[in-house]
Structure formats: structure tokens, C-alpha cells
Amino acid sequence: MSFGDIVVQARQRIGLSQKHLASQLRKEDGSPISAQYLHDIEKGRRNPPPPPLLDQLAQALNLPPDYLYYAAGELPQDLREAGLGPEQVHKVFGALRDELKSGHKT
């Protein structure tokens, strides 16, 4: 499932229109994102948004932030700031792969 598909499903699950959700999300300058920008994200025409918008999306959609970061191919800020070395990152992702292969959902 793509990042856009996740956003669409979560948005529809809680009954929000694109316009309403977009009005809740703020760019760095404090202005709301456009419904067109959100539409493009949902359709995969734009890359997933930057971390500050991922956090806002997670809150607005009642999703765990880590789930959206994972779907967007991003590391959450606390992990980026932790200064993990290559071996630690490899170990964490290896554990996740092992968990997925064993059929368990994390």
C-alpha cells in the first residue's frame, strides 16, 4: 500500500474531505496546505510531505506517527537525532525484517 493510499483510507475512515484535512495542515509559514497538494500526495504525484507535516497528518488522521514515517520512508526525528551509526540502523531494520518474515505484525 502506498503512502497516498494510507492517507486516503485514514481520511475516509474518519469522514474528512480533502479540503477539510488540508485546512488542518500547516506549512512552515503557518498557512494551510492546499487541497490540490493533498490530492497530489494521495495520488502519488508528490513525494510524501516533510516530517513536520507527517506529524500533523498523523495527529489529524489518528494514526501513530511512526506508521506514517515508515510509509513515507522517513526516520522519526527522535531516531534521526539519536545519532545511530550504520551498524545500529542495520540491526534495527534487520530486526524489523525478521519480525515481518515471521508473520508477526509490529
Predicted regions and their residues:
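Recognition helix of helix-turn-helix/homeodomain-like DNA-binding domains
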Residues: 26-48
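A short, Lys/Arg-rich alpha-helix, primarily the initiator
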Residues: 1-16, 23
